[in-house]
């Protein structure tokens, strides 16, 4: 059931403020329209077509049906978890299910209050505003969101000093969907204003296999179920990586003039791209090797590892560490990062004894 739109934000023509004059900055197209359309086609459009995240889907299904029954907007939703697990896709699915628009932006793009103000005033009843990397919102922008989320009201300060006045503008009832890889970095006032807070987990191999088979069908790629499974096993539990690896294996099969992707061909291709059987790439192995060879397995601080590898500390923490922690190759303690026995064995090295001193009896 679609939500009725009023399309009126009750703005007075006499209100003049920088906050009400958002600049429209044209963005360069980084990819061709055909490529963008293809990428969009890989995303499922409805909740029933979304593979994986079973518990989360049930929570969202109930929220959608309840909101439709009351003809209301869905409560504000915070999605958190490692990158590439489908947070943006879920926001688009919510909009499709609710038959409303979805406006997509990222916190770093909302540098000035006028940026978020323009977005909020343009929203119609039921619309979804998706903010990626929401933990990176600056203080002023975040404070503007508080009354917007809670009371659907925008408070704007007119003038300066003692003559300053606060004018409140009514907003359409909308849904804010925030996405973050660092939920602990959100302030309590912002986090507490989300009615739904849901975590996305890494995907199982069989779920990634289904995603790869679906993507292969869309891209007209011939692949066997076992070939899809071989790619899924190296996809780090992440759909975005699974689709990327499929495209690289597709290129390899095309050049090698192979009509179908099977496990042997997939392994050959991914070995060429230095993606091993657990999905670790060159940088993953570099982090583990550096920790083991230069720091005797740890414990070692993140900055020290970053300096030794030449990688950005934030990149290591947000891109590489989550999967290494998930598969048990890395441990984080109050003293720093530690390579586990499994990491030594994966790299073909003999772990020291005892590897983890705190486990000694």
Swiss-Prot record:
<protein>
    <recommendedName>
        <fullName>Holliday junction branch migration complex subunit RuvB</fullName>
        <ecNumber>3.6.4.-</ecNumber>
    </recommendedName>
</protein>
<dbReference type="InterPro" id="IPR004605">
    <property type="entry name" value="DNA_helicase_Holl-junc_RuvB"/>
</dbReference>
<feature type="compositionally biased region" description="Polar residues">
    <location>
        <begin position="1"/>
        <end position="15"/>
    </location>
</feature>
<comment type="function">
    <text>The RuvA-RuvB-RuvC complex processes Holliday junction (HJ) DNA during genetic recombination and DNA repair, while the RuvA-RuvB complex plays an important role in the rescue of blocked DNA replication forks via replication fork reversal (RFR). RuvA specifically binds to HJ cruciform DNA, conferring on it an open structure. The RuvB hexamer acts as an ATP-dependent pump, pulling dsDNA into and through the RuvAB complex. RuvB forms 2 homohexamers on either side of HJ DNA bound by 1 or 2 RuvA tetramers; 4 subunits per hexamer contact DNA at a time.</text>
</comment>
<feature type="binding site">
    <location>
        <position position="240"/>
    </location>
    <ligand>
        <name>ATP</name>
    </ligand>
</feature>
<feature type="binding site">
    <location>
        <position position="337"/>
    </location>
    <ligand>
        <name>DNA</name>
    </ligand>
</feature>
<dbReference type="GO" id="GO:0006310">
    <property type="term" value="P:DNA recombination"/>
</dbReference>
<feature type="binding site">
    <location>
        <position position="203"/>
    </location>
    <ligand>
        <name>ATP</name>
    </ligand>
</feature>
<dbReference type="GO" id="GO:0048476">
    <property type="term" value="C:Holliday junction resolvase complex"/>
</dbReference>
<keyword id="KW-0547">Nucleotide-binding</keyword>
<feature type="binding site">
    <location>
        <position position="88"/>
    </location>
    <ligand>
        <name>Mg(2+)</name>
    </ligand>
</feature>
<dbReference type="GO" id="GO:0016887">
    <property type="term" value="F:ATP hydrolysis activity"/>
</dbReference>
<dbReference type="GO" id="GO:0005524">
    <property type="term" value="F:ATP binding"/>
</dbReference>
<feature type="region of interest" description="Disordered">
    <location>
        <begin position="1"/>
        <end position="41"/>
    </location>
</feature>
<keyword id="KW-0238">DNA-binding</keyword>
<feature type="region of interest" description="Large ATPase domain (RuvB-L)">
    <location>
        <begin position="13"/>
        <end position="203"/>
    </location>
</feature>
<feature type="compositionally biased region" description="Polar residues">
    <location>
        <begin position="28"/>
        <end position="40"/>
    </location>
</feature>
<comment type="function">
    <text>Participates in UV-tolerance of Synechocystis PCC 6803.</text>
</comment>
<feature type="binding site">
    <location>
        <position position="43"/>
    </location>
    <ligand>
        <name>ATP</name>
    </ligand>
</feature>
<dbReference type="GO" id="GO:0000400">
    <property type="term" value="F:four-way junction DNA binding"/>
</dbReference>
<dbReference type="InterPro" id="IPR036388">
    <property type="entry name" value="WH-like_DNA-bd_sf"/>
</dbReference>
<dbReference type="InterPro" id="IPR036390">
    <property type="entry name" value="WH_DNA-bd_sf"/>
</dbReference>
<feature type="binding site">
    <location>
        <position position="193"/>
    </location>
    <ligand>
        <name>ATP</name>
    </ligand>
</feature>
<dbReference type="InterPro" id="IPR041445">
    <property type="entry name" value="AAA_lid_4"/>
</dbReference>
<dbReference type="GO" id="GO:0009378">
    <property type="term" value="F:four-way junction helicase activity"/>
</dbReference>
<keyword id="KW-0067">ATP-binding</keyword>
<comment type="subunit">
    <text>Homohexamer. Forms an RuvA(8)-RuvB(12)-Holliday junction (HJ) complex. HJ DNA is sandwiched between 2 RuvA tetramers; dsDNA enters through RuvA and exits via RuvB. An RuvB hexamer assembles on each DNA strand where it exits the tetramer. Each RuvB hexamer is contacted by two RuvA subunits (via domain III) on 2 adjacent RuvB subunits; this complex drives branch migration. In the full resolvosome a probable DNA-RuvA(4)-RuvB(12)-RuvC(2) complex forms which resolves the HJ.</text>
</comment>
<keyword id="KW-0963">Cytoplasm</keyword>
<keyword id="KW-0233">DNA recombination</keyword>
<dbReference type="InterPro" id="IPR027417">
    <property type="entry name" value="P-loop_NTPase"/>
</dbReference>
<dbReference type="InterPro" id="IPR003593">
    <property type="entry name" value="AAA+_ATPase"/>
</dbReference>
<dbReference type="Pfam" id="PF17864">
    <property type="entry name" value="AAA_lid_4"/>
</dbReference>
<feature type="binding site">
    <location>
        <position position="332"/>
    </location>
    <ligand>
        <name>DNA</name>
    </ligand>
</feature>
<dbReference type="GO" id="GO:0005737">
    <property type="term" value="C:cytoplasm"/>
</dbReference>
<keyword id="KW-0234">DNA repair</keyword>
<feature type="region of interest" description="Small ATPAse domain (RuvB-S)">
    <location>
        <begin position="204"/>
        <end position="274"/>
    </location>
</feature>
<keyword id="KW-0378">Hydrolase</keyword>
<dbReference type="Pfam" id="PF05491">
    <property type="entry name" value="RuvB_C"/>
</dbReference>
<dbReference type="Pfam" id="PF05496">
    <property type="entry name" value="RuvB_N"/>
</dbReference>
<dbReference type="InterPro" id="IPR008824">
    <property type="entry name" value="RuvB-like_N"/>
</dbReference>
<feature type="binding site">
    <location>
        <position position="84"/>
    </location>
    <ligand>
        <name>ATP</name>
    </ligand>
</feature>
<feature type="binding site">
    <location>
        <position position="88"/>
    </location>
    <ligand>
        <name>ATP</name>
    </ligand>
</feature>
